């Protein structure tokens, strides 16, 4: 076993990396409220795992979406638990994100030289809300359908480009199969990649600049 570790150590310098991670200075003013961002990340990882599990059974069609969710809840082993954890974790992620934003704002974490960290955080907040909007529609029940109809119709109030944006969100002039396909694609592919990229940038900035000092 030691030989295997030595082989990886020689090539990856695992010990040096571990020392760099564990020896990072933590200011004395840091308290439990500074963990809100990390809790948000944990919620996202739970979302990713449970969401990935449900993709094995969910069918993104207007005729089968609701019945596939019922199948997950009633027939799949622990399916009810996986979907419930996905829903609870989604709510917790949004709550933790909001509290994290308030903490950063109230402690001045957005000030120079951390402007880019703040901007990337705001983008992450928008992506998180987008996860909620797209995921809410996937069961394609009455609540999800009318939520999509309302949300996709809001941009129509924008002059000149409003109708174009709404048609882009719906995949046409009305809510239907194209809409569900787009929301499913966004929820399971586009948004996860976007949030991964901005999370990486966000964490690299925090790693580079450290935690902001007390007010």
Curated annotation (Swiss-Prot):
CDD domains in the record: Cytochrome_b_N
InterPro entries in UniProt: Cyt_b/b6_N, Cyt_B6_PetB, Cytb/b6-like_sf, Cytochrome_b_N_euk/bac, Di-haem_cyt_TM
Binding-site residues, heme b 1: 100, 202
GO cellular component: plasma membrane-derived thylakoid membrane
Pfam families listed in its UniProt record: Cytochrome_B (PF00033)
Biological processes per GO annotation: photosynthesis; respiratory electron transport chain
Record-listed heme c binding positions: 35
Keyword Amino-acid biosynthesis: no
Residues annotated to bind heme b 2: 86, 187
Cofactor(s) required for function per UniProt: heme b; heme c
Note on cofactor: Binds 2 heme b groups non-covalently with two histidine residues as axial ligands.
Subcellular location: Cellular thylakoid membrane
Disulphide linkage map: none
Parts of the chain that traverse the membrane: 32-52, 90-110, 116-136, 186-206
Bilayer topology annotation: Multi-pass membrane protein
Function of the protein: Component of the cytochrome b6-f complex, which mediates electron transfer between photosystem II (PSII) and photosystem I (PSI), cyclic electron flow around PSI, and state transitions.
Family from the record: Belongs to the cytochrome b family. PetB subfamily.
Additional record remark: Heme 1 (or BH or b566) is high-potential and absorbs at about 566 nm, and heme 2 (or BL or b562) is low-potential and absorbs at about 562 nm.
Protein name: Cytochrome b6
Originating organism: Nostoc punctiforme (strain ATCC 29133 / PCC 73102)
UniProt gene name: petB
């Amino acid at each position: 076993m030691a030989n295997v570790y030595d082989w990886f150590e020689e090539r990856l310098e695992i010990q040096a990396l571990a020392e760099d991670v564990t020896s990072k200075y933590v200011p004395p003013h840091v308290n439990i409220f500074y963990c809100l961002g990390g809790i948000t990340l944990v919620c996202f990882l739970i979302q990713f795992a449970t969401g990935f599990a449900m993709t094995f059974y969910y069918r993104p069609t207007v005729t089968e979406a609701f019945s596939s969710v019922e199948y997950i809840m009633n027939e799949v082993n622990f399916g009810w638990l996986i979907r419930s954890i996905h829903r609870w974790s989604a709510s917790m992620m949004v709550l933790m994100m909001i509290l994290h934003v308030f903490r950063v704002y109230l402690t001045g974490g957005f000030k120079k030289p951390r402007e880019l960290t703040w901007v990337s955080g705001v983008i992450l907040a928008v992506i998180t809300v987008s996860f909620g909007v797209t995921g809410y529609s996937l069961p394609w029940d009455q609540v999800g359908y009318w939520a999509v109809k309302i949300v996709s119709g809001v941009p129509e109030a924008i002059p000149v480009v409003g109708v174009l944006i709404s048609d882009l969100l719906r995949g046409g002039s009305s809510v239907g199969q194209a809409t569900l396909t787009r929301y499913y694609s966004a929820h399971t592919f586009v948004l996860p990649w976007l949030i991964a990229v901005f999370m990486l940038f966000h964490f690299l900035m925090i790693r580079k600049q450290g935690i902001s000092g007390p007010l």
